[in-house]
Amino acid sequence: MASELQRPDSMPCHNRQVNSTSSPSPEHLLAEDRVLDHAEENNAAMAKLTLLPGHAHSSVLSERDSPACCSTNLHSENHSDSSDSGNYDAPVGGDSLLGDCELSRQIGAQLKLLPMNDQIRELQTIIRDKTASRGDFMFSADRLIRLVVEEGLNQLPYKECMVTTPTGHKYEGVKFEKGNCGVSIMRSGEAMEQGLRDCCRSIRIGKILIQSDEETQRAKVYYAKFPPDIHRRKVLLMYPILSTGNTVIEAVKVLIEHGVQPSVIILLSLFSTPHGAKSIIQEFPEITILTTEVHPVAPTHFGQKYFGTD
């Protein structure tokens, strides 16, 4: 009997551990409460963050944590500077990425970004890759241009219409409102013309040539030809790379001289710097800019490589 009464004291130690865990001490409970409270505070803070749709690398707006937001963007900018060397891409200083909270507030809804996904990211990577062949470069550029043009068409007005199907049924749909045209800023803007024609076969396209004056180094208009009724049309202005924004600003001024209002101009671009986008919006607050990426390093080699003159 004595040996049987002693058995409970000689049970394996892991049973005693389970028993101690099932009856936590008051100090342990207080520690768990502190962890849960901390997690709830973090969740509440995260609930105040708003991401632009599809852009994990883009704007992060916070009601109370803007310094943290901006520090993240500065890290991204430093990383990009270390990964791009030489004059292949031209950095434009003065601003960080679009993720900079203050820049996002300044530009606002007039700057529209394509929803980011791996397909677009790969196309951007190939276009920026110094070792990419011209064939791969053009193929990727044309694909990205097509995506930008398709999204640009979504910004144009539609109207409801009724059609009859081959089986005799009525179908309520939509169609473009008349009065749209494209304008390419030569010469890199001409790379986007085919993408627009692939989507709108009969659209009219004008051209404008702007270059820097050799003496004054200021943007100067050398050639401009538009549809005669452009003042009554909505304009898709095509220019793939926004670096300083000066060329686009000059082009918009010419369009205004021909009776076009900035509010009906949609600028289609592949890449933009923060400085370029902000300069255009500050000059013309009503214009709409559509691009795939806002980054301080602009691939200014685009036109030369696309047309084989690099």
Curated annotation (Swiss-Prot):
Predominant place of localization: cytoplasm
Keyword GTP-binding: yes
Residue(s) carrying Phosphoserine: 25
Ligand binding (5-phospho-alpha-D-ribose 1-diphosphate): 187, 239-247
Listed Polar residues bias regions: 16-25
Region feature Disordered, mapped onto this chain: 1-27, 62-89
Annotated family: Belongs to the UPRTase family.
Protein name: Uracil phosphoribosyltransferase homolog
Species this protein is from: Mus musculus
